[in-house]
């Protein structure tokens, strides 16, 4: 009786193994596509699994595109070129206009003695005006993305401060972005609408530029004080904050001097009053350029790149990159 039961069990087991082997051969041969694919012979389960995995990988391959970097530029070098371009152009316009067009750039409505032409004068004559406008066009292009880079950089620093300070600090970051964008737009306006073409509009745009520039400097210094309070800063960060404060002080003092001598020239026509006005105007312009030049200490080793790839792959790629501190 026991032998009969054992034989039956063995027969059932053999039958089950045979059925499993048959199904495996059918799957491995593509569901019975060949003449003997399901009728005898042996099939290797490892080979079957390898074949199925290979087919699945082939099906996924078109969807899993790799992230490709098409352009990679040093953010440091980009900022250096952007900041120095108007400074070099301004110097070139000053020298060439002073040497070759002396009478044109020194003419004023008071007809008084003058030795230093204003920025509007040296960039309003031809061909300097075209050179200046071309350089400002190249300068403004990178300024817009740099403004948003600063916004994202400041937002990444919000974790340093207490939660109670975050809402007001976020508003300050947004204010800095708006002031920066208005300053950039005003720079374009005061460049392309010269005082000789439309003096009232040129004057109002210049005032807008001055106000936004000073407010931007002050707000940036205030924000750095909030974000860096109680933090251990690097030498470059300390240098950046130090020069921002110095250049803001120079801008404030120069603005006071500019207003005083503008009034003396406009209402009293004093000799050399316009020259002093122009002198302080140059100081303001140079201080503004150098203030933005401090970005080389804020972003000493970052890069700007153009990347191609699916959004999910790009997000995963960027999530593995080190974040800004």
Swiss-Prot record:
Keyword Transmembrane: yes
InterPro entries attached to this UniProt entry: Frag1/DRAM/Sfk1 (IPR019402), PGAP2 (IPR039545)
The entry's keywords: Membrane, Transmembrane, Transmembrane helix
Single GO biological process annotation from the record: GPI anchor biosynthetic process
Membrane topology (UniProt): Multi-pass membrane protein
Natural source organism: Drosophila melanogaster
Transmembrane segments: 80-100, 130-150, 171-191, 205-225, 243-263, 276-296
Disulfide bonds: none
Family statement: Belongs to the PGAP2 family.
Keyword Transmembrane helix among UniProt keywords: yes
Record Pfam families: Frag1
Name of the protein described by the UniProt record: Post-GPI attachment to proteins factor 2-like
Location of the protein in the cell: Membrane
GO cellular component, one term: Golgi membrane
High-level lineage: Eukaryota, Metazoa, Ecdysozoa, Arthropoda, Hexapoda
Lineage: superkingdom: Eukaryota
